[in-house]
Amino acid sequence: MSTTGLSHASDTTRLVIPDLDAGLNFLSRLPLANPLQSEVSLNQFFDSLLQSPPAALTYLNLLEQTRVPLCFVEEELARRYVNKPLPPGDVEAQAFDQVVEVWRKVTRAYSQCAQLDSDADDPEHPLRVALVLHRCLYYTTMIIVEHYRARREIPAGVWLDLHGYYASAEEWGVATYPLADALDPHGRSTHCMAAYVMALLMDVSGPYSLSVRDQGIVRRWATQWAPLVSIHGAEPGEALPPFAVDLMQDTGLKSISDSLNTSQLRRLDTSRLAMVLTQVRQQLAQKLSPAQIGLGEDCSVGHCRRLLDHLARPWTQARAARKFRRQAASGIAKVGAGFEAMHFFISGKEFSQPENVRMYSRQDFDTLFVFRQMDDPTAKLQIQQGTQVARPDEWEVVNQSANGFRLMRSIAGAKIAHGQLLAVCPHDGDRFILAQVTWLMQDRSGGLVAGIAALPGTPQAIATRLLSGHTGKAELYTQAFLLPAVDAINAPQSLVLPVGWFQPSRVIEIYSETPVRVRLDHILQDGPDFERVSYVLEK
């Protein structure tokens, strides 16, 4: 990168930004096609501003010019750790730390800019205060968002920082001061209250239970609808909603029964948001497309309905009754992942091809020939495939309900992903069941915490294969599972297949004791590594 117009300290190679033109020239030459190099350059740029800050107005203008390229670069780097299983590898952990540190650094830069802007008599001063506080709210929220996307626990103090920036906006009287936002794709204005509400809505959406894709959709909707929510102080004797924000607590929106200092409470008026949610759900029921009603073009009607159903209670501050009561528990659960391992744990034996399709290698036949006198001529040919199945990981049971568990584990063990299929032997049982990871987070100590929900029915380990069709090629069987119907919860009989197998009306062959052909009906449940599908017997 050319450094024309820039200077460096004589005793170091540290970059110095002497004026607005030099800073703009530096930013105009960012190699955005190379996000890694752009990250280095932006860090150098922010370090320069923090160590040798220019005049306040110049400082603010330069920071504003970084918003679009900065968010682009960090989004590209986030691809290294977003949607990856836990615990993260070294490359993923390093990328995460880099992105979070940049958000912290730019927040410090805006805060420093505010300290340098001492011209309180300037009529534009309130606008600059509002702008700085909004950006501090935005970038602190990005720290929270990155932790959600990486499924990491929020560090201590981050929520207090966010509350502090919003409280400052209230004190200055600029909480709803309209501000331009270069990051808004529709050119809409925003304000500090909306930025703060967006973070609170994200938090109560249950981000650790959402896929990364759904987190992105929820974040977009929260940004879009946050201006509909207003924040008010707690008046003496006033009835409060079930949830409120305590500005002195290091958490987001929470039950007010836990808050004693009402002077620091802030309540959210979500009545307008509730009306919009009701209207949008009605419009979807009337067959309007998500794009037509402003929900975006990246989600289907069914997907939007499910996500809106998930958000309806928390975003309107209605207490959600648990479908199954959670009870404290203790003990060690055994957990296995991957179809090969799960099949072994559930069946109790290694998987082998059924006799009708079994094929033997030259080594197998050589072994049989050498030891043919030792074989029972009446016995079926048995050749061990030599696969080595890993031992199950051990997880500590924290609590349980009728359909699942909350488990925790140290950092040691196999990687695990949100939505993944697991075979679990409960602490109080002796048989493995199938379950899906529905909630996943890495805590501050590095350990993993997971919520898992059991699939309905007792699984039976079976074999399945695709039919050869017109190719004439014999297909080998692979591991799968059969789940019986559970009438009590209206769960039909189903198959659990590797991801990618389902096609509507596809005919496959399953094998337990004899081969049976079945026609796949529709997907009941899925994840990154499996599909649970209903089926009917092929006539």
Predicted features by range, described:
Residues 2-201:
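Long, leucine/valine-rich, helix-dominated scaffolding and oligomerization segments
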Residues 19, 38-41, 74, 87, ...:
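Serine/threonine-rich low-complexity intrinsically disordered regions
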Residues 175-361:
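Extended, domain-scale alpha-helical bundle/helix-rich regions
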Residues 317, 321-430, 439-444, 449-459, ...:
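Short strand-loop-strand
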